[in-house]
Amino acid sequence: MGTGASEKQAEQKVRRAFEASEEAHGTLAASTPWVAMGSAYGSCTCLGAQPVTDLALWPVIYSCMGFSPQAYPAFWAYPWVLYGGYLWMGYPPPAALVPSVWLYWRGASSFDPLIGSPYLAALAPNLFPFPMKFPPTYSLASPTLGGATSSHCPQVGCWTPASSAPRAAVEGPSRGAPYLKTCKAPPSEWASRFGIWAPLPCCSSELRPLPPSPIEDSQLDPGCSRSSSRSPCRARRRLFEC
């Protein structure tokens, strides 16, 4: 009895949100429809293939505690919403190329720039009753672009270890440390508004290995004096370029 009442209340809340959005923003544009998920209290009522593009509707779409891992094997590819003690899920708008985490706290929803497995892994023990495994990184490249980003970074805000040169000069290079190139999401109204940042492993092919050790430098290059054999030959150093 209580399950049916809670599902009915959730459905009414979603319908009211749709009506309010249509009045404020007009007809919703076509986008990927939201999907129904399993819940600890039953199944959420699906409103059909109603498209959702208004970000204001995200916190009031579905109130479900969980989902079926068999039906959603790649659950990390969807945005998650924590709202009123419930976990909600939906497809991202077309402009969003990476997973997003939303928080609901004290009656207001806000975007959290912490994207991907670290944040979801922190929430997982309290939200999911079964073990989960997250991918280490996310690619900002759209599936339709294919390998277009394998040879260069078309995104804005490219960052490499060269941009942290002052820190490297003080601490020295960390031999064997993984150097990942980080790029900002493609320019769009949604992505630029929230400033999404995520690792971009597809650009790792451009990264060059660390220069040889100081001893090898002095042996191979006669221009390096013996007095500088203990310190790297800076003339032979290579900068990591974007």
Swiss-Prot record:
Protein's name according to its UniProt entry = Proline-rich protein 23E
Q: Where is this region: Disordered?
A: 213-234
Annotated organism of origin? Homo sapiens
The text of the family note is: Belongs to the PRR23 family.
Q: Which PANTHER family match?
A: PROLINE-RICH PROTEIN 23B, PROLINE-RICH PROTEIN 23E
Q: Which domain of life is it from?
A: Eukaryota
